[in-house]
Amino acid sequence: VLKELADQPAHDLVNKKIVPDQIVPTGGYDIENLSDPSRRSAYHGSIETDRYGRSIPKQAHGTQNLDDYTSSSHRIMNAAVDLFDRLIDPTLLIRRLYIVANHIIPEDTALQKKDRFTQLDLFTDYAAEEQKQKANAADLERERKLQEAMLSIRKKFGKNAVLKAMNLEEGATAKDRNNQIGGHKA
């Protein structure tokens, strides 16, 4: 589900021609974690009160900086999953997940900012680094073209016209979320 949640904003970023360099995944825990005696005894973290006055485990929240400004769904998904695995308590039930993209700028501005300075040293093979950067740039360009093709198909035939295999796995919610309007059944 988290990969689906990270993939959708990446497509929105490509559509709007904007790029972030930071993502913030947040996971809120379910109230059942503290009402179930076995889970309650296993949990030793902080407890907060929700807006209804109920006690719930404190939500997991973290920030992951990306290497560069990007709208690559692959890089955003990997960063979100890595941070999620470090933050979320696997013994607790999760009620809600959301991902926020920070430090958003237009793509053309990001291309101008790409010329960053690097500290040189004697032990790095800069020819190999340059080859790696060229291969990475080619991969990002190929992914970008694929994302744009998927967006054009989705605009013409609907959001469920093109789905990834992860959207068809058991427990996946993207297909259902694509049929909703404002989070409600259409």
Regions found by a protein language model. Give the residues of each.
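Basic, low-complexity intrinsically disordered segments
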Residues: 1-186
